[in-house]
C-alpha cells in the first residue's frame, strides 16, 4: 500500500501567549501545500484516509489537501504530534490500515516525527530532513511494519 507522510506547510512562529499547537500556516505555507496537493492528486487521485495531527497548522494543511483529493475520510490523531513515538505510530497505523483495508493513506504531521517515521519504516534510509509541505512516498507493508522509501517531494520540485 502507498503511505504518504507529509509535513505541514510553513507556519508562523509562536508569539506572545500563543503555544506551538496554535501556530498557523503562512500565506507561503498555504501555497506550498496547494502545490504538493496538486502533485499528489496527479499521482494518487483517491486516498482512503488522511490522518492528521490536532495542531492547527496540520489541520490547515489537511483542509487544503482534502480540498484537492478524493478521500474516504479524515481522522485526527493525538499521537502524531512533534514529540510522537515513531514505533508506536507505525504499529497503530498498520492496525488501522489492516482493519479498514486501506490501499493509500496520507499522514499529516510535524518534524521530527515525520523524519523518524521514514527511518522506522525503512532503516536503510537516514532520517530525512523534511521541508515544509514535503511528502515522503513509502511502499508500506502493514503486515511486517516495514516499508520501502521511494522519494521525498518538495513544493518547489512539484511546481516545476
Language-model regions: role of each:
Residues 81-97:
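Short phosphate-binding loop-to-helix
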Residues 43-46, 96-103:
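Glycine-rich phosphate-binding loop signature in dinucleotide/nucleotide-binding domains
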Residues 3, 101-109, 113:
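Generic beta-sheet signal
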Residues 115-117, 158-159:
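Short, well-ordered, mixed-charge alpha-helical segments that flank or form enzyme active sites
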Residues 122-150, 155-159:
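Domain-level recognition of soluble alpha/beta enzyme cores
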Residues 2-84, 114, 125-133:
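Active-site-proximal alpha-helix that buttresses catalytic centers in soluble enzyme cores
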